[in-house]
Amino acid sequence: MDNMSPRLRAFLSEPIGEKDVCWVDGISHELAINLVTKGINKAYILLGQFLLMHKNEAEFQRWLICCFGATECEAQQTSHCLKEWCACFL
């Protein structure tokens, strides 16, 4: 856990609950706006999509890039964050 970003460490420190999507590591302000505009305003909704994709990081990353304009780096960070959260809490 030493090489984790502070944002990732904070996200993994507790259940998702009602956290806004901007709490997810990898979600920039601009990407959060794009997600919220299309109805994904909570972290648990984004996690739900990740789970619907069977935790397939490559597929999830393509979805973020194609549908919401995420950069490759944002998509990778976000999928890694959700994968790590699943490992801790599911």
Curated annotation (Swiss-Prot):
Key words, A-Z: Cytoplasm, Nucleus
GO molecular function, one term: identical protein binding
GO terms classed as biological process: chromosome organization
Subcellular location: Nucleus; Cytoplasm
Superkingdom classification of source: Eukaryota
Main location: nucleus
Family membership: Belongs to the BAF family.
Described purpose of this protein according to its UniProt entry: May play a role in BANF1 regulation and influence tissue-specific roles of BANF1.
Name of this protein: Barrier-to-autointegration factor-like protein
